[in-house]
Amino acid sequence: YFFANLLSATLLTITILFYVIIYTIWLKQKTSQNIVIGGAAGAFPPIIGWTIATGSITLEPILLFLIIFFWTPSHFWALSLYKKEDYKNAKIPMLPVTAGIKTTKINIFIYSLILFVIALTPFFFGYSSLVYFVFASVIGYYYVYLCYKLFIEKSIELEKKLAKRIFFYSILYLFLIFTTILLDNI
């Protein structure tokens, strides 16, 4: 608080408490929606950073929050598909363990579609250029394509390979989206 502002300090405190108490202590062990709800804590850093720099909350950091928020489920559920037994043995109720592989694949695909649309919104609000829009469309299309391939895949062996591929691509995807937003606004 002494080095930023009260708004940033408050948001950071809420984020930490939410992550530690709501997500880690309470939800992680109780519900397969732990990733969706806990994803909010992981998505708050752009808003906190923005408030440190500006002292206010505007639409720009909210869009960044939404990108991370809608990225989180497909990223972690892909991981939980190819590490299902580990989660099961640890008694962590990830979606593949509680609802099955088919439901998880449907959810991964749905979240990838939502993410695709959300990632394009900075362009529609005038926060990024056509270069960002085209690049985000291409890498987002590939992400949706991978998630669709997983959705229709019947082979357990190939499902695990695709899930692992989605997990690692999702990391690259998020890095590229945020790097492109940054470079597009220099």
Please give the residue ranges for each predicted region:
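Interfacial loop-to-transmembrane junctions
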Residues: 145-176
